[in-house]
Structures are given as structure tokens and as C-alpha cells.
Swiss-Prot record:
Molecular function (Gene Ontology), one example: L-malate dehydrogenase (NAD+) activity
Catalysed reactions, as listed in the record: (S)-malate + NAD(+) = oxaloacetate + NADH + H(+)
Any GO BP annotation: malate metabolic process
Gene3D superfamilies recorded: Lactate dehydrogenase/glycoside hydrolase, family 4, C-terminal, NAD(P)-binding Rossmann-like Domain
EC nos: 1.1.1.37
Family classification: Belongs to the LDH/MDH superfamily. MDH type 2 family.
Name of the protein: Malate dehydrogenase
InterPro entries tied to this protein: L-lactate/malate_DH, Lactate/malate_DH_C, Lactate/malate_DH_N, Lactate_DH/Glyco_Ohase_4_C, Malate_DH_type2, NAD(P)-bd_dom_sf
């Protein structure tokens, strides 16, 4: 097989459920495309060497043509050395009844360390995708500890929320999923995220025209998406894994193998954004890729009073989380 290029990729939390699903999609070509080789490093904590060796065996047994090299490691320095991309999946998990403040404290040290090692080991233009919750704040911590890396290359995953919203709109309108476009999530990946149905299109028409029941949009769909993660935990006793892995692959593919004009929601550094969100936050915006390979935050979208108020609530939460971790 003739490859266009080979990229070096690190995945943390390699023995966890999300990583287990994601690794096979990555090696198959679902992230970087079918002509891109993968130099893969799978990381997890010391003490998990045996489990890592089992994952290596399975990846080897798949005989993926794109998987040019593979190593498993319990050293962050080894995992991040010279990488082009990192998927920071490993984090202290959220369990039933756990508050976000508990997660902030437990994960602050994890992402501070990972950011510091990225700063000394990764390529200067490496792209970093953070999945572990609270994802916006964890991403901000890692970004803040890696000043040598481009702040624009840090992303917190909102694609799972985008996918959830797309599915709910499609089901309600009784149309195929690909008929629902311009799905926008603002703010934090939390129960205060803002699924902005006023921007979405269904079969090319405004979603609020196709689904005229504003009460359903505001009071059923929106809170259902906001609380979907908790609902999954209550139902299965564990956080979303397969759907999160799928969303991560799609989120990264939108950046590495973009579709012309595609809108996607991602948490990025708020510096110089066109919506007046304070700088030095990781905030969810609708974005699209440019021919240069960089992204832009889609400008010029208007907020009605309902959406504007929801965005302020989400902004307040992100700002408070940042203030809390700054004290740790």
C-alpha cells in the first residue's frame, strides 16, 4: 500500500473503554484517512502493563495495513515524544452521584502533568484532543501547561453532544440523519451546554420551521441532550464509551480530513473569537476548516434571548471551573 504520509499519534487511557473502541477505528483509517500510516503509542498508568500488552496483541491480530508501528507504554515522555497528535482520553471517571467539582480536583493533576510533558516532548504543531471530563477545563489545564504548543491546536470534544442533537432532530423530523446540518453546541460539555437549535437546518430549511413546536425544542430536546451523559450512567452504570469513541473519531476527522463547508462544534481557545466570549477559556464554538488547514470560528451567527441567556449560564460555569482549578 502506498501511503501519502505517516503520523505519530499518542492515545492516553489506553486500557479504558473509550480508548478500546477508539484505537481500532484509528488504526483502520477512520481518523486520518485510508492513505495515512499510523505510528501509534498507547499509554496508561504503571501497573497496567499486562492489560496494555493484551491490547497490543489485539491490534497486532487485526493486521491493519495502516498501522506502521505500535508500542504500549507507561511513560508519558515515551508516548508523547515527537508526536503529531494526541488523544487525551485517560481521566478519573465520573460515577453515579459524582459532582463535577470532584472531577475537577481529581483530574487537575493528571492534565497538568500531561500538558507539561506535551510541552517538552510533542512537535510544536501537534494537535491535541481532550476527552476526559470535565473536558473544557481539562483541556484548558493542558493548554496552559504547554506554552510552546499552538493554543489553537487544543480541542475539547463536543462532537458527542453534536451527534446527540443531530439524532434527536432527525428522529423528530422523521428525516435521515444527513438531512440535519449546521448542528451547533456552544459553551461547556456539561449539563449547561447550549444545543443551539436556532442555527440548525433540516433538509436545507431552518429547524425551527420544520419543527415548529418551540416547547419541545426548549424543554424536551435541549435538557435531554444536556443530561444525556448522566442518563447513560444511570442506565448502564458506566459513562458513554462506544458513542464517545465514535464521536472522537469524527471530531478529529473533521479537522484532518475535512469536508468542504462542513460545520462542526468543538471546544477551542476563545482568544480573538467573534462573539465577545472572554479570552483564555476553552469554549464550544461552531467551526469549519479553511483551505490553509486551519479552522475558523463561524462568524455572524445571531442569538435570540433564550439562547443568549443559556450561553451566559454556560460561560459562567466555565469561568468558575477555571477559577477553581487555578486555586488547586
Amino acid at each position: 500500500m502506498k501511503l501519502a504520509r505517516t503520523v505519530s499519534v499518542a492515545v492516553t487511557g489506553g486500557t479504558g473503554q473509550i480508548a478500546y473502541s477508539f484505537l481500532f477505528a484509528l488504526a483502520h483509517g477512520d481518523v486520518f484517512g485510508s492513505d495515512c500510516g499510523i505510528d501509534l503509542r498507547v499509554y496508561d498508568l504503571p501497573g497496567l502493563e499486562r492489560v496494555l500488552s493484551g491490547i497490543r496483541m489485539e491490534l497486532d491480530d487485526c493486521a491493519y495495513p495502516l498501522l506502521q508501528s505500535l508500542r504500549v507504554t507507561t511513560s508519558l515522555e515515551d508516548a508523547f515524544d515527537g508526536i503529531d497528535a494526541a488523544f487525551l482520553i485517560g481521566a478519573a471517571p465520573r460515577g453515579p452521584g459524582m459532582e463535577r467539582s470532584d472531577l475537577l480536583k481529581r483530574n487537575g493533576e493528571i492534565f497538568s502533568l500531561q500538558g507539561s510533558v506535551l510541552n517538552t516532548s510533542a512537535k510544536r504543531d501537534a494537535k491535541i484532543f481532550v476527552v476526559g471530563n470535565p473536558v473544557n477545563t481539562n483541556c484548558w489545564i493542558a493548554m496552559s501547561r504547554a506554552p510552546k504548543l499552538n493554543r489553537r491546536n487544543f480541542h475539547s470534544m463536543l462532537r458527542l453532544d453534536q451527534n446527540r442533537m443531530q439524532a434527536m432532530l432527525a428522529h423528530r423530523a422523521q428525516v435521515p440523519l444527513d438531512e440535519v446540518t449546521n448542528v451547533v453546541i456552544w459553551g461547556n460539555h456539561s449539563a449547561k451546554q447550549v444545543p443551539d437549535f436556532t442555527q440548525s437546518l433540516i433538509s436545507g430549511k431552518p429547524a425551527v420551521e420544520v419543527i415548529s413546536d418551540r416547547d419541545w425544542l426548549e424543554n424536551i430536546m435541549l435538557p435531554s441532550i444536556q443530561n444525556r451523559g448522566s442518563a447513560v450512567i444511570e442506565a448502564r452504570g458506566k459513562s458513554s464509551a462506544g458513542s464517545a469513541a465514535r464521536a472522537l473519531a469524527e471530531a478529529a476527522r473533521s479537522i484532518f480530513v475535512p469536508k468542504e463547508g462542513e460545520w462542526f462544534s468543538t471546544g477551542v481557545c476563545s482568544d480573538y473569537n467573534p462573539y465577545g466570549i472572554p479570552e483564555d477559556l476553552i469554549f464550544g464554538f461552531p467551526c469549519r476548516m479553511l483551505p490553509s488547514g486551519d479552522y475558523e470560528i463561524i462568524p455572524g451567527l445571531s442569538w435570540d434571548v433564550f439562547i443568549k441567556n443559556k450561553i451566559q449560564i454556560s460561560l459562567d460555569e466555565i469561568s468558575q471551573e477555571k477559577a477553581n482549578v487555578s486555586l488547586l
